[in-house]
Curated annotation (Swiss-Prot):
Reactions accelerated catalytically: (+-)-pavine + S-adenosyl-L-methionine = N-methylpavine + S-adenosyl-L-homocysteine + H(+); (S)-reticuline + S-adenosyl-L-methionine = (S)-tembetarine + S-adenosyl-L-homocysteine + H(+); (S)-stylopine + S-adenosyl-L-methionine = (S)-cis-N-methylstylopine + S-adenosyl-L-homocysteine; (S)-scoulerine + S-adenosyl-L-methionine = (S)-cis-N-methylscoulerine + S-adenosyl-L-homocysteine
Organism: Thalictrum flavum subsp. glaucum (Yellow meadow rue)
Disulphide bond pairs: none
The protein, known as: Pavine N-methyltransferase
GO molecular function: methyltransferase activity
Principal subcellular localisation of the protein: cytoplasm
Function: N-methyltransferase with a substrate preference for (+-)-pavine and (S)-reticuline, but also active with the protoberberines scoulerine and stylopine and, to a lesser extent, tetrahydropapaverine (THP) and tetrahydropalmatine. Is not active on (R)-reticuline, cryptopine, glaucine, codeine, canadaline, noscapine and berbamine.
Entry binding sites for S-adenosyl-L-homocysteine: 96-97, 135, 159, 163, 185-186, 201
Organism lineage: Eukaryota, Viridiplantae, Streptophyta, Embryophyta, Tracheophyta
UniProt family annotation: Belongs to the CFA/CMAS family.
Active site per UniProt: 331
EC number(s) per entry: 2.1.1.300
Gene Ontology biological process: methylation
Binding site for (S)-tetrahydropapaverine: 205
């Protein structure tokens, strides 16, 4: 018991040091490399038989869970980040998921547009369709589709009041009359309306039971309609965001709630009770890795302005520094993780479904 307590205390002390900005970027990268190797050692099995059994067991375990856990304090803070901060860290469209980097010279703004164009191409968007964007955030994809396909009616769903207000304000500025934003939790949303195309980008990560989620969404897919899903993944194995061991500072610091899932690239193929896979792609982890690097650079280049924004928003210098450090470590750790083995471990999966 004494050893266990000592390890827990060591992690708690490390997190305090991180929060106080006492751990250098290089130390964070080094610690993340160790964490990544531990996760790979945990995830990879000696035989393919064991590897497949692990994934199938994990997929089956999800089927016994609720669709999603209640949004907790951390998630609420992530949804209600001060908008001026997002304008600094993210690109012009405020896309809060990875962009597509054609090469290292691609700018963050370009990467956001390239990725959303890829979504539209792979989801087979055509003018005149009805589009549903689940968990639309600040409307990057909703507004992109609405501008590019003026004949489309685009509906976005968000559970954030500030996000809805921002999107509707952008619609006025862009003279868009083909956008509707519904303020609702996706897991509680009900409608008899069906849509030609449905997007679920960076949403699956917040779900537990993919079967229940896809069953619900399938009722909103029109005849001959399609559902496009993008999610973060490891190429082979899946896991809950729970501490790997007692030395796991990363999960304790970045995802203390334990409500997220890191799925595998193929896991959604095991959930075809109500939808059928039409196509499936993966994108290298280089894309999110480069995106996190760009976020970090923009944050650091504007650090004084960020301090002012956070002090005003959170009410104290101490809390401002805590959140600045959190976002810096978030970017450093994930840039490191997604770059592992040249982007061939953690990556992005995109799946196109049709209704059964």
């Amino acid at each position: 018991m004494e050893t266990k307590q000592t390890k827990k205390e060591a992690v708690a002390n490390l997190i305090k040091r991180i929060e106080h900005g006492e751990v250098s970027d290089e130390e964070i990268r080094g610690m993340m490399k160790i964490q990544v190797q531990k996760r790979l050692k945990w995830g990879y099995k000696p035989t393919h038989e064991q590897q497949l059994a692990q994934l199938v067991t994990f997929a089956q375990s999800l089927k016994g869970m609720e669709m999603a856990e209640e949004v907790d304090t951390l998630d609420a803070e992530l949804y209600e980040i001060p908008l001026p901060f997002l304008h600094i860290m993210c690109g012009k469209t405020l896309k809060f998921s990875p962009g597509y980097f054609k090469d290292e010279s691609t700018t963050l703004d370009e990467s956001e547009v390239y990725m959303m164009d890829l979504y539209c191409e792979r989801a087979q968007i055509k003018d005149g369709q009805s589009i549903l964007d689940l968990g639309c955030g600040h409307g990057s994809l909703t507004l992109h589709v609405a501008q590019k396909y003026r004949g489309c009616k685009v509906t976005g769903i968000t559970n954030s009041v500030s996000q809805k207000e921002f999107i509707m304000d952008q619609c006025k500025k862009l003279d868009l009359s083909n956008v509707e934003i519904i303020l609702e939790d996706v897991t509680k949303f009900e409608t008899e309306i069906t849509y030609d195309r449905i997007f679920a980008v960076a949403l699956i990560e917040h779900m537990k039971n993919y079967e229940l989620f896809l069953k619900k969404v399938s009722t909103w897919i029109a005849q001959y309609g399609l559902l496009f899903v993008e999610h973060h993944c490891h190429k082979v194995f899946a896991y809950q965001y729970e501490p790997l061991d007692e030395d796991d500072w990363y999960t304790e610091y970045i995802f203390p709630s334990g409500t997220l899932v890191m799925s595998s690239s193929s896991i959604l193929l095991y959930f075809q009770e109500d939808v059928s896979v039409v196509n499936h792609w993966t994108l290298s982890g280089k894309h999110p890795s480069l995106g996190f690097k760009q976020w970090l650079k923009r944050l650091d280049d504007n650090i004084d302005e960020v301090k002012e924004i956070f002090e005003s928003f959170y009410g104290s210098k101490e809390k401002a520094m805590k959140f600045i450090t959190y976002w810096r470590v978030f970017c450093i750790a994930h840039s490191q993780m997604y770059s592992t083995n040249n982007g061939e471990e953690w990556m992005l999966s995109q799946v196109l479904f049709k209704k059964k």
